[in-house]
A protein has these predicted regions:
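Conserved donor NDP-sugar-binding/catalytic core segment of glycosyltransferases
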Residues: 104-139
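Active-site nucleotide-sugar/metal-binding loop of Leloir-type enzymes
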Residues: 78-95
Length: 196
């Protein structure tokens, strides 16, 4: 049996303080993505340069530069992500992840996440527990385990295609809207708190 393939899409705007940690975290995974498209949404800091350096050493990383929308709303990020989704649309993959540019996780994160999907055929959207580092202290952001934080949503391709991806909503809530649509199609959504 072949190992499932996954792709990641990240929207990044002026993330030079965090993007290297995220790149390191993904590049250290026990199961690497088939492709990771990082959409630089008009970054004016060193974000693009940092991604380019990592892409030289890791061919699965691709930088996609786009013009930043003049409109400043939650939907600007969704527009950037949609351009990344279009970039991977013709690739062969089984899962797609939406990953924020300031996230780090354990080296077996995606391996363990894929195991959950393998064991649960109706699992449509899943992710791990989000923790925030504040003044050197790790603070868990516990939420309803039947919901998944938008920063780490990982979807079965069939579920992603049925939901139509992230809707552009002016005042936010795109991740929740995608989850609700997934549930309406009979998919389960789940946060696995042991995944960090």
């Amino acid at each position: 049996m072949t190992r499932p393939r996954y792709v990641l899409v990240t929207a990044a705007y002026n993330e030079e303080r965090h993007i290297a940690d995220t790149l390191r975290s993904v590049a250290s995974q026990s199961v690497l993505p088939h492709r990771w498209v990082i959409v630089s949404d008009g970054s004016t800091d060193r974000t693009d340069d940092i991604v380019i350096e990592w892409a030289k050493r890791h061919p699965f990383i691709e930088l996609l530069r786009v013009q930043r929308s003049a409109e400043h709303s939650f939907s600007a990020k969704v527009r950037a992500l949609r351009q990344g989704f279009a970039r991977v649309a013709d690739l062969e993959y089984d899962f797609i992840g939406v990953l924020d540019a300031d996230i780090s996780f354990e080296p077996d994160y995606f391996q363990r996440l894929l195991e959950h999907f393998s064991n649960e055929p109706r699992l449509g959207i899943a992710g791990g527990n989000i923790q925030q580092l504040v003044d050197g202290v790790v603070i868990p952001r516990i939420k309803d385990l039947s919901s998944v934080a938008g920063a780490v949503q990982f979807l079965r391709r069939e579920c992603f295609e049925q939901t139509g991806g992230l809707p552009a909503l002016r005042y936010g809530g795109e991740d929740a809207a995608m989850e609700i649509t997934a549930r309406m199609h009979g998919w389960r959504t789940q946060t696995f708190p042991e995944l960090k």
